[in-house]
Amino acid sequence: MISSNDFRTGSTIELDGDAYVVIEFQHVKPGKGAAFVRTKLKNIKTGSVVERTFRAGEKVPKARLERRQMQYLYSDGDDYTFMDVENFEQITLQRDQIEEQLRFLKENMNVHVLTWNGNLMGVELPNTVELKVVATEPGIRGDTATGGSKPATLETGAIVQVPFFINEGEMLIIDTRTGAYVSRA
């Protein structure tokens, strides 16, 4: 059991027979009445996001997710194949199970495959990944005065906002949790 006071971003809980990960949480202490914790929870199986409020100190069952280190090998239509790096066992996940992670997933990348109660739940990417810019507009001299940004298409097809000084062919470090540019590689 985990107390609602101990919720952190990334905490996993069991609710209504499903596993959820805490995306956002906020402790609220109103002037009148008891404190409570407002959360945004993501269903690990379906990917849907729900908002839920818990009383401060309320006990909730902790979802025990098993994380296995695997390597992404290839895709075949809507099937994505991963290999366990320890015993070389291969598993296949459907596109709808890993839809959000596809933006930053590239071949031979090491990831964690999540299982809960023996069921494959999804993929957890590293916090940052190194990706190549395949298309972006050239930065025009003097554009940086406002510190703006421009869209860039990465090798995985994801489009992220990058500073004006980034050019095609450069390797970037991208935060997979937010989809934001971090730095040049």
From Swiss-Prot:
> Entry's InterPro entries?
Elong-fact-P_C (IPR015365), NA-bd_OB-fold (IPR012340), Rib_uL2_dom2 (IPR014722), Transl_elong_fac_P/YeiP (IPR020599), Transl_elong_KOW-like (IPR013185), Transl_elong_P/YeiP_cen (IPR001059), Transl_elong_P/YeiP_CS (IPR013852), Transl_elongation_fac_P (IPR011768)
Entry-linked Gene3D superfamilies:
2.30.30.30, Nucleic acid-binding proteins
The record's principal subcellular location, in a coarse class, is cytoplasm
Pathway, according to UniProt? Protein biosynthesis; polypeptide chain elongation
Q: What is one Pfam family matched by this protein?
A: Elong-fact-P_C
Q: Which GO terms describe its molecular function?
A: translation elongation factor activity
Record key words, sorted: Cytoplasm, Elongation factor, Protein biosynthesis
Q: Name one GO cellular component term.
A: cytoplasm
- Reading the lineage from the top rank, the first entry is Bacteria
SS bond list: none
Q: Which CDD domains match?
A: S1_EF-P_repeat_1, S1_EF-P_repeat_2
Subcellular location per UniProt equals:
Cytoplasm
Q: Which GO terms describe its biological process?
A: peptide biosynthetic process
Q: Does the keyword Cytoplasm apply?
A: yes
The record describes the protein's role as: Involved in peptide bond synthesis. Stimulates efficient translation and peptide-bond synthesis on native or reconstituted 70S ribosomes in vitro. Probably functions indirectly by altering the affinity of the ribosome for aminoacyl-tRNA, thus increasing their reactivity as acceptors for peptidyl transferase.
Annotated family = Belongs to the elongation factor P family.
Q: Can you name this protein?
A: Elongation factor P
